[in-house]
């Protein structure tokens, strides 16, 4: 079966984990890995796995895009450089899946709103953050039953799983995730907090999701909705697990989740990597299926959507 050829930009934890996810895909093929440090472990790993590599950043990839028929690129660099990366690749007709918190394209959480993005051609979609991918499905599961005035999430992440790129973007991470709790999750006001946990051995990714409903919570319907949503996420992140809840205290609904990774690049505690890379892969697959079916055609654009 024909596959859509992909480039990965950023050779850190997220970019390297992505190679494994994309290699398993029936419709995606990883061809290029782009970095800026010739000595980086990610570039070495990519070469071992048969990818072409460049340490000259996106500019090192541009001359090869057309001859290698690259149609989808994943940006796992930093919010600070994403807009420029996206512009250069969009001009060549490459669709961008943004794994930074830059959020210049529409925000995407696969089980919540992926379908509406694939129906209209977007040349740049944003995956929000690992915390967003782990928690917004639950906020949405509650808000689709009844209105939510406030949604707050706390994500606890193992320090060893957080690379320099994510650390440099923590402010953007917080802002973009808070915004997405409102736009995608459906809460009128959203707040996101990230805790980087230095414990050794590293702890699994943990997420606490709290929502305040306008009316008294309809407990049976909320429980049913949350459990159904967890099953949807588990289709692409098998380690997504309910620890406790939904718990009800007046109008407050609280859900405790844990995310174990598949252990592709980093060990299983790094569920935050997995939920991000799996969501990005799932998103790219949906677009790839449409491209292969001929229902959408990528076109060069002057500026990202």
From Swiss-Prot:
The keyword Translocase does not apply. InterPro entries: Acetaldehyde_dehydrogenase, Acetylaldehyde_DH_C, NAD(P)-bd_dom_sf, Semialdehyde_DH_NAD-bd. This is Acetaldehyde dehydrogenase 5. SMART domains: Semialdhyde_dh. NAD(+) binds at residues 11-14, 161-169, 272. The active site is at 130 (acyl-thioester intermediate). It comes from Dechloromonas aromatica (strain RCB). GO terms for molecular function: acetaldehyde dehydrogenase (acetylating) activity; NAD binding. Belongs to the acetaldehyde dehydrogenase family.
């Amino acid at each position: 079966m024909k596959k859509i050829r992909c480039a990965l930009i950023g050779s850190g934890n997220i970019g390297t984990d992505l190679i494994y996810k994309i290699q398993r895909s029936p419709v995606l093929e990883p061809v290029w890995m782009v970095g800026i440090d010739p000595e980086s472990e990610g570039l070495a790993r990519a070469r071992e796995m048969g990818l072409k590599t460049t340490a000259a950043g996106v500019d090192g990839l541009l001359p090869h895009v057309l001859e290698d028929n690259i149609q989808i690129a994943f940006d796992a660099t930093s919010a600070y450089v994403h807009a420029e990366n996206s512009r250069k690749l969009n001009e060549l007709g490459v669709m961008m899946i943004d794994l930074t918190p830059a959020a210049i394209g529409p925000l995407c959480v696969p089980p919540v709103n992926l379908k509406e993005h694939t129906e209209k051609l977007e040349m740049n979609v944003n995956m929000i953050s690992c915390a967003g991918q782990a928690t917004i499905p639950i906020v949405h599961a509650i808000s689709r039953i009844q209105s939510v005035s406030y949604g707050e999430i706390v994500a606890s992440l193992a320090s060893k799983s957080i690379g320099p790129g994510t650390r440099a973007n923590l402010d953007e991470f917080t802002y973009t995730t808070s915004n997405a709790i409102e736009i995608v999750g459906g809460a009128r006001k959203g707040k996101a907090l990230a805790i980087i946990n230095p414990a050794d051995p590293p702890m699994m990714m943990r997420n606490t999701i709290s929502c305040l409903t306008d009316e008294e919570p309809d407990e049976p319907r909320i429980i049913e909705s949350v459990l159904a949503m967890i099953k949807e996420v588990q289709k692409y992140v098998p380690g997504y697990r309910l620890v406790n809840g939904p718990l009800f205290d007046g109008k407050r609904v609280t859900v405790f989740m844990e995310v174990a990774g598949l252990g592709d690049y980093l060990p299983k505690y790094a569920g935050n990597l997995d939920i991000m890379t799996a969501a990005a892969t799932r998103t790219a697959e949906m677009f790839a299926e449409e491209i292969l079916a001929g229902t959408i055609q990528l076109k060069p654009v002057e500026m990202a959507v």
